[in-house]
A protein has these predicted regions:
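Active-site-proximal alpha-helical segments within enzyme catalytic domains
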Residues: 21-42, 110-125
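Solvent-exposed loop/turn segments at secondary-structure junctions
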Residues: 13-17, 30, 37, 41, ...
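Non-transmembrane alpha-helical segments in soluble domains
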Residues: 31-38, 54, 58, 72, ...
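Sec/Tat-exported extracytoplasmic proteins
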Residues: 1-5, 27, 34-41, 61, ...
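Active-site Gly/Thr loop motif
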Residues: 4-10, 59-121
Length: 153
């Protein structure tokens, strides 16, 4: 992929890798990962990840049908995400314009959104939003509407 070095956080000093979270990588590298997912594991003419594995990542694995293998399958529209009420900071006001949007979500709201239909990968990095009304779907939907020619809301 041409990525820089990255770090995986541990659960404690000299402990076990927290593979469900805490992958520290540069913004450009997160975009490369998003592009790899968008292209079903293909980089140029090389299949780096089997396309079948990418497809299996995107099969719903929980009762709500919104989570696959470490990837979110739809915008958070309920007050409890993963059973954690505090996740309301990342609520969505609407579903994604592209219903096939998938995304990776980090600890402080860092998000890699992926739309194959619109050939778009977008990254949101920065500090955790400070207000409870942060809308996790607005930014990506604004981009999707722009590239698709759909009127803004």
């Amino acid at each position: 992929l041409g990525c820089s070095e990255a770090e995986v956080g541990l659960d404690r000093r000299q402990g076990t890798a927290r593979t469900f979270a805490t992958l520290f990588a540069r913004a450009q590298d997160w975009l490369r990962i998003g592009e790899l997912i968008r292209c079903n594991g293909l980089q140029g003419d090389r299949q780096l990840v089997p396309a079948d594995w990418i497809r299996r990542m995107e099969v719903p694995r929980n009762a709500d049908g919104d989570y696959g293998y470490h990837i979110w399958l739809k915008a958070h529209r309920t007050r409890s995400v993963r059973g954690i009420p505090a996740a309301q900071h990342f609520m969505a006001s609407e579903d994604f314009v592209d219903p096939d949007t998938v995304y990776l979500e980090g600890m402080h709201g860092q998000t890699v959104c992926i739309s194959r239909r619109h050939e778009l990968v977008a990254l949101r990095i920065g500090r955790k939003p400070r207000h409870a009304h942060w809308d996790s779907s607005h930014l990506f939907n604004t981009l999707l509407r722009e590239v698709s020619g759909e009127p803004a809301r």
